[in-house]
Amino acid sequence: MDKLADLNYTLSVITLMNDTLHSIIQDPGMAYFPYIASVLTVLFTLHKASIPTMKIALKTSKCSYKVIKYCMVTIINTLLKLAGYKEQVTTKDEIEQQMDRIIKEMRRQLEMIDKLTTREIEQVELLKRIHDKLAARSVDAIDMSKEFNQKNIRTLDEWESGKNPYEPSEVTASM
C-alpha cells in the first residue's frame, strides 16, 4: 500500500509541476517548455530514487563516505549527460584503476616489442650467416680435378661396345 501511495504521490507531483508550468508560461507554443519539463521530471525522479537508495546504502554499508561519493558522482554524471556534455566526473579510485589498466597495457606492449626485437636480431644474424656462406670468394687457380662432371669422362675406346651411346641412331616408326 505504501508503494501505491508513493506512486500516486509521484504522479500528483508531476501533474502539479506540469500545471504550474502551464500557468507560468501562458504561451503554449513556447519552444523551451519540453526541455524544462524534462529536466524537472528527471530531477524529481532522481530525488525520489536517490533518497531511499542512499538510506538503504548508508544503513547496510560500513563506509558511508564512499557510498555518498559514488551516488553524488553518478548523479552529476547523469546531469552532465542530460546537458549534452561528453565529459564525466571521476573519483580518485576510478582514475587509479584506469592508470593501472594503462600501465598493464604498456607493460604488455613493451614485452611484445622486446620479443619482436629479439626475433629481428636473430633474423639479422641468420641473414648475415647466409650472406657469408653465399659470398663469392676469389680463387687464384681453379682445380678442375675435383669437379664432379670431370670424373666420368670416357673415351671412345673405353666404352664397352666401342661406339658412343649418346649419338642419335636411326629410328623407324610404324604409321
Curated annotation (Swiss-Prot):
Lineage, uppermost ranks: Viruses, Riboviria, Orthornavirae, Duplornaviricota, Resentoviricetes
Protein name: Non-structural glycoprotein 4
Stretches assigned to the Lumenal side: 1-28
Membrane-spanning segments: 29-51
Annotated binding of Ca(2+), by residue: 120, 123
One GO biological process term: symbiont-mediated activation of host autophagy
Disulfide bonds: none
Record flagged with keyword Transmembrane helix: yes
Principal subcellular localisation of the protein: host cell
Gene3D superfamilies linked to this entry: 1.20.5.430
